[in-house]
Amino acid sequence: MRHDHFEYYLGGSDDEITLRENRAAFGRILLRPRMLRDSSHRDLSVTVLGQKLDLPFMVAPMALAKLAHPQGELAVARAAKSRGVGVVLSTLSTVPLEDIAQIRPNPLWFQLYVYKDRAITRDLVGRAEASGYGALVVTVDTPYLGKRERDIRNPLQIPEEYVVANLNKPDSPRQGEARPDTGLNTVIARYDDSLTWKDMEWLASITNMPVLVKGVLRGDDAKLAVEHGMKGVIVSNHGGRQLDTAIATITALPDVVAGVDGKADVLLDGGVRRGTDVLKALALGAKAVLVGRPIYFALAVGGELGVLQAFDLLRDEFDLAMALCGVHRADDIPQDILAI
């Protein structure tokens, strides 16, 4: 992997305090396992948006997977389908959303950035729905790009052949502007920086897909999400890449769970590296977690096989953590196993 591509995937914003805190906060939560609970059988499945997931983790939306491997999102989707892992495809993928839909990982959701030009937004939503995507994930923490100093020191250069495929479809609005020859600045400058909750209502009104909002870190915002028709809330700080010193996602999770008050599903991304991290997030009320960087680094090292191995590691670690904690069902993990 080229150094600028590695830095793009690895880095956070400013001093990377939030990036580190996402991991450190998981480490501060210790476990209080139960004994003699018959650990011979465990059910790792969960239900999210009314759909059963074989495993309680999904692939987080990350841009430009071909920077890690020539097969990019195709390899990730094939591995996910093989292991029963869900995928949230990024707007900024290097493979068209229609091609990923043909592989049919399940569930398959589409992550959306809302553009100033609503024709682009409508086009993306319509294409995702027509292709069979099961949900729309709207990222709301990026009205502007965070100050990512690794990318300043090592400017991201995207090869000409690695276009932002979803914005480069010949019949898409303004497709000719989507070639990221000089990095992502041109694409990101088109994001709508004036979004409000009313825009979330509008998005919900133009699709039959359930809409989740990604980037919430507060219970009051989670409550507003429910009031404006969101079916899910993803606790996220963009992997520590936007506002530095923002709260860690696992720290924010209980407040968000309380805010939705059982009226929407809550998921979490940011800092998930081990099976015990998945266990802790579920014990605090998340229905599932999203995993980003570990999947893309596995892709860089081993392609589709590397991603398969990453899925297997996380599944096996989570299964072992459940067994050692005396927990039988992933969808019924008691909070009292946590020392908080």
PLM regions: where:
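Alpha/beta catalytic cores of nucleotide-metabolism and tRNA/nucleoside-modifying enzymes
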Residues: 1-27, 248-340
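Short catalytic-loop micro-motif centered on adjacent basic/acidic residues
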Residues: 9, 87-89, 109-112, 212-213, ...
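Active-site-adjacent beta-strand anchor residues
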Residues: 12, 90, 111, 138, ...
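Short, conserved beta-strand segments within well-ordered enzyme catalytic domains
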Residues: 30, 45-47, 56-60, 86-90, ...
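A gly/proline- and charged-residue-enriched helix-loop-helix capping module
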Residues: 81-103, 107-121
